[in-house]
Amino acid sequence: ATTAQLQWVVDAYSVVFAGALLLAGSLGDRFGRRRALVIGLVVFGLGSLAAGFATTADMLILCRAVMGIGGAFIMPSTLSILVQVFTDRQARAQAIGIWAAVAGAAIAIGPIVGGLLIEHTTWHAIFWVNPPLVVIAIIATFALVPESRDPSKPRLDVMGAVLSSVGIIAFV
């Protein structure tokens, strides 16, 4: 793989994630946050599974972009679900604090675990970790998370979503 391809393996996730984040959050508010979370988990899990079997750098880049779409649905839906489920202000603040701490810890621990997996197995293993976790998360979501959506059913601003996504991608 070229140096540029290796950089895109890293950047494809972030660029697509950033570009899709606002639209994914809006879709979750309109059509259901639990539904958006499950869709995000499925897309992320399938992208990760496919990345684990990638045979070319271009295929891996595409899989990382798919994972970015999934992540863009997961992040806003989880935060919105917390806000809906925890109605007490103190409990909500604590839940959001835990959510942020777990996300921060994952960002710090992920590369360490990934490095250990690569050192002792194969690079493919860093992507094979996610699908079993995704299955557990989907089961837990159906068992524990109530469906919620914005009761005002806001109109989806397609042009605004496209322009903001393009702008964010260009900025990133």
Predicted region positions:
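Extracellular/periplasmic helix-loop-helix junction of adjacent transmembrane segments
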Residues: 1-20, 57-62, 95
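Membrane-interface helix termini in secondary transporters
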Residues: 25-26, 30, 116
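Helix-breaking motifs and short loop linkers at transmembrane-helix boundaries and internal kinks
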Residues: 32, 53-59, 121-122
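Juxtamembrane helix-start motifs in multi-pass secondary transporters
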Residues: 33-39
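C-terminal ends and interior cores of transmembrane alpha-helices
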Residues: 42-55
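Cytoplasmic helix-loop-helix junction between adjacent transmembrane helices
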Residues: 65-101
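Hydrophobic transmembrane-helix bundles of small-molecule transporters
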Residues: 97, 119-172
